[in-house]
Curated annotation (Swiss-Prot):
This is 2-phospho-L-lactate guanylyltransferase. Homodimer. GO terms for molecular function: GTP binding; phospholactate guanylyltransferase activity. Its EC number is 2.7.7.68. GO terms for biological process: F420-0 metabolic process.
Length: 219
């Protein structure tokens, strides 16, 4: 089984700019990618990365394409005649068990939705009869595409896999629930604050009341 992980090399996670510096965003993105690729490899999945410019990554083949995301991924599907996974690079809570549970499904298409109508992971057993359409309400689009092509589907319901890190408000899930290097790094540069009622991730220097989690991992 192969998995393709799209990864943006430059100007990564710009929607986290309200909290993190460009250097911090870049480091966090790389650590999330490391957590994800390590998890996939532990589940016996061969990892390939899809990027728009060359870079090196241990343990994965890097595929460079100048095309936009959808055309690049659809070219990839056309070039494969065996099952493949498409995994987004911002779901660092995904576990080996999550991956193995998806692989155990007999459905032609296994889809794990993201929050807000997106699609975080797809397992595609018939890439010759399927194409992707990311952005917008892509979960509904992918369910429709599968139905139109006569493919069976399973919606994989998982907190871990649905928790994508796009905006500053999403970081709370990684901070509290993360066990990998991305979470450790986030905890080293931020703290939790509940001075406004709902807990959120802030910078240490903020003049706010920090919340310490019992047993919180550091480092």
């Amino acid at each position: 089984m192969k998995a393709i992980v799209p990864f943006k090399v430059v100007n990564v996670k710009s929607r986290l700019a309200s909290l993190l510096t460009p250097e911090e965003r870049s480091e966090l993105a790389k650590l999330m990618l490391r957590d994800i690729t390590s998890t996939l490899a532990a589940a016996g999945v061969e990892v390939e990365l899809l990027t728009t410019q060359p870079f090196e990554w241990d343990g994965a083949t890097v595929i460079v394409s100048e095309k936009e995301l959808n055309p690049a991924l659809n070219d990839y599907l056309l070039a494969n005649d065996s099952p493949v996974m498409i995994v987004m690079a911002d779901i660092p809570l995904i576990t080996e068990k999550n991956v193995r549970d998806m692989l155990a499904s007999p459905a032609d298409i296994v889809i794990c939705p993201g929050r807000g109508g997106g699609t975080n992971v797809q397992l595609i057993r018939r890439p010759d009869k399927y194409h992707v359409d990311y952005y917008g309400a892509s979960f509904m689009d992918h369910m429709r595409i599968a139905q139109e092509n006569g493919l069976t589907t399973e919606v994989f319901d998982s907190f871990n896999v649905s928790s994508d890190i796009d905006e500053a408000g999403d970081l709370i899930e990684l901070y509290i629930h993360g066990k990998g290097d991305a979470a450790k790094y986030l905890r080293s540069i931020t703290v939790l604050d509940d001075s406004k009622g709902r807990v959120r991730v802030v910078k240490e220097e903020s003049n706010l009341r920090a919340v310490r989690i019992p047993g919180k991992m550091t480092g």
